Swiss-Prot record:
The keyword Isomerase does not apply. Residues 80-91 have a biased composition (Gly residues). Residues 8-75 form the CSD domain. SUPFAM superfamilies: Nucleic acid-binding proteins, Retrovirus zinc finger-like domains. It comes from the Eukaryota. The lineage of its organism: Eukaryota, Viridiplantae, Streptophyta, Embryophyta, Tracheophyta. A zinc finger (CCHC-type) spans 157-174, 194-211. It comes from Nicotiana sylvestris. Residues 54-91 are annotated as: Disordered. This is Glycine-rich protein 2. PROSITE patterns: CSD_1, CSD_2, ZF_CCHC.
Length: 214
């Protein structure tokens, strides 16, 4: 192995981690693996080495007596191949790949949000069949609030005169025309005001009226 500084040697990159910023080179002459730091790589761009690539380097002794490779280049001074941003983290298929990440088959966009049976807009999800705002679901749908048989529909609790909850029409302080809140079967209906249809007074129903006949 070339022990003197300034004498170049050849070797193969054993491994290099971009994340850690260092790795090791195996010299061609069979010597011990040499430590190589990111700062010891000659490169105009990102300083990295690819596992298994052939390199040339100088050997330098550090203050602790250990040797390391410096001024590392490709063969005949050419640029190193580098890990191209990969080493240590690999180039795994993340987001967008099959079975992984957002938009991938089986992940994110299929079976997840907006997919069949799940997420927003999917069958059985929010806005879908059986979900909010449609058939059998939340507000505005069949069986939901504001829909057929839901809150405000088919009678329900609350005052049919003013539409407010918490009291009945007979206790309502507001006078008003018929056709109360809600939809099918809602109180109020036609036929004048929201009181007794016998005497026209507010505050009681016809069955409670004390005045004479109709």
């Amino acid at each position: 192995m070339a022990e003197e500084s300034g004498q170049r040697a050849k070797g193969t990159v054993k491994w290099f981690s971009d994340q850690k910023g260092f790795g090791f080179i195996t010299p061609d002459d069979g010597g011990e693996d040499l430590f190589v730091h990111q700062s010891g790589i000659r490169s105009e761009g990102f300083r990295s080495l690819a596992e298994g690539e052939t390199v040339e380097f100088e050997v330098e002794s550090g203050g602790d007596g250990r040797t390391k490779a410096v001024d590392v280049t490709g063969p005949d001074g050419a640029a190193v191949q580098g890990g191209r941003g990969g080493g240590g983290g690999g180039g795994g298929r993340g987001g967008g790949g099959y079975g992984g990440g957002s938009g991938g088959y089986g992940g994110g966009g299929r079976g997840g949000s907006r997919g069949y049976g799940g997420g927003d807009g999917g069958y059985g999800g929010g806005g879908g069949y059986g979900g909010g705002s449609r058939y059998g679901g939340g507000g505005g749908g069949y069986g939901g609030g504001g829909g057929y048989g839901g809150g405000g529909s088919g009678g329900g609790s609350g005052c049919f005169k003013c539409g407010e909850s918490g009291h009945f029409a007979r206790d309502c302080s507001q006078s008003g025309g018929g056709g109360g809140g809600g939809r099918f079967g809602g109180g109020g209906g036609g036929g004048g005001g929201g009181g007794c249809y016998k005497c026209g007074e507010d505050g009681h129903f016809a069955r409670e009226c004390t005045s004479g006949g109709r």
